[in-house]
């Protein structure tokens, strides 16, 4: 089918039958996109297990939205960037590695 391989932006619910968890994960991951996956389960252990296996930038479980301070971003062709939270600000930072810096030295104001 095409619908599970496309990145759809809209109120669309796609339900595809499966026999095993492994098959469900394979169907969900068999796409070049990976913005958000949704997991519905009465078993917290199963939901956690599935969330770890899914290839998406964000996973929402049992209708719970992402928390405040969470980033927004995907994987694969859905992009690698992160917006929001500490991960979003890191896009604008330029790290510098300094070897042998002595933090015990008190520097005079210039």
Labelled PLM ranges:
Residues 1-110:
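Conserved C-terminal structural/oligomerization subdomain of aldehyde/semialdehyde dehydrogenase
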């Amino acid at each position: 089918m095409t619908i599970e391989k496309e990145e759809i932006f809209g109120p669309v619910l796609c339900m595809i039958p499966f026999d095993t968890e492994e098959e469900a994960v394979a169907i969900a991951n068999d796409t070049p996109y990976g913005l958000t996956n949704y997991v519905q389960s009465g078993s917290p252990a199963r939901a956690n297990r599935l969330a770890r296996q899914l290839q998406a930038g964000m996973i929402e479980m049992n209708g719970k939205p992402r928390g405040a301070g969470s980033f927004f971003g995907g994987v694969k062709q859905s992009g690698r960037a992160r917006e929001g939270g500490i991960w979003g600000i890191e896009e604008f930072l330029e790290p510098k590695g300094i070897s042998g810096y002595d933090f015990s030295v008190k520097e005079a104001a210039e």
